[in-house]
Amino acid sequence: MIPEERLDQITQRFQYLEAAMADGASGSDIAALAKEYSDLRPVVEQIAAWRQLCADMDEARAMLSDPDMKALAEEELPLLKARLPEAEQALQLALLPKDAADARPAMLEIRPGTGGDEAALFAGDLLRMYQRYAEARGWKLELIELQETELGGIKEVVARISGENVFARLKYESGVHRVQRVPETESGGRIHTSAATVAVLPEAQDVDIQIDPGDIRIDTMRSSGAGGQHVNTTDSAVRITHLPSGIVVTSSEKSQHRNREIAMQVLKTRLYDLERQRLDRERSASRSAQVGTGDRSERIRTYNFPQGRMTDHRINLTLYKLDAVMQGDLDEVIDALAADGQARMLAEMGQ
């Protein structure tokens, strides 16, 4: 059942925003109004389409009592009824609550798990996969912290990704990614299993998190590259420790001032993420957990190189195009995860 009262409220709010912008709101007000207007516009369009279809059906039913129009009505009414389920689903999807963080940039963190050198190499493969995906979508990926191994793997990487709907797409990537393949150093041809952990965090804004200067300790140190080699001669790298939570953030750009800015932004993002996780746990106490907001220790995906397949365990999706996936072709799996998340939310709305 579609709530007519809510549809009226949304339509009235949209009309108010339209009038307010036409009257010439100024400064930050106009930006906020324009953002809300843009968000509501597709919803209002779905409302109008659904209401027009309902009106057309009512008109066709009324025509049944008119001998001159009955034949036409009997022809049109089944066609209109056939369009109704699709229109209702489109409207229900438009009415689903939006995650305010979906449009934000994201922090991508990748760390090797079990598997030693092979896990570190796989972490590097995942980074390249996301770099190619970001490039394909026209996003900007900036490396904030990159610690490499002597074999070319990754001990840890933190990157910032900005662009359209970055977090909305990448939030499903958080979790444990497992790889099954024969390492290049394996002379016996045995398949090894290793893993890497991916975390995708929506970037915090100043209004989200306020940090007490007394709660942090800032240390400077020398930047280091692969194998711990010093890559510049000044103590430009910055490490910030948030004492209440124990979170430690580092940044190793050449500018110490820039490193402080970057490290503080990463710290705010991690603290914001902790708060989002707390709220998610509270909400999940009264509803089923949604895909994309689960435990990051959960194994979400397996990349099997000998069989050329990728399996996402959350939705039991298997794709036999591993080479394409590793080259950044992720839309098919992300679209499926997003659709599953929407279906779960629709089911909960109907309970």
From Swiss-Prot:
SUPFAM superfamilies referenced in this protein's UniProt entry, alphabetically: Release factor
Gene3D superfamilies: 3.30.160.20, 3.30.70.1660, 6.10.140.1950
Principal cellular location given in the protein's record: cytoplasm
GO cellular component, one term: cytoplasm
Residue numbers of N5-methylglutamine PTMs: Q229
Cellular localisation: Cytoplasm
Chain ranges passing through the membrane: none
PROSITE patterns tied to this protein: RF_PROK_I (PS00745)
Cited InterPro entries: PCRF (IPR005139), Pep_chain_release_fac_I (IPR000352), Pep_chain_release_fac_I_sf (IPR045853), Prokaryotic/Mito_RF (IPR050057), RF-1 (IPR004373)
GO MF: translation release factor activity, codon specific
Entry comment on modification after translation: Methylated by PrmC. Methylation increases the termination efficiency of RF1.
Keywords: Cytoplasm, Methylation, Protein biosynthesis
General function of this protein: Peptide chain release factor 1 directs the termination of translation in response to the peptide chain termination codons UAG and UAA.
HAMAP family: Rel_fac_1 (MF_00093)
UniProt similarity note: Belongs to the prokaryotic/mitochondrial release factor family.
Name this polypeptide is given: Peptide chain release factor 1
Organism: Ruegeria pomeroyi (strain ATCC 700808 / DSM 15171 / DSS-3)
Organismal lineage: Bacteria, Pseudomonadati, Pseudomonadota, Alphaproteobacteria, Rhodobacterales
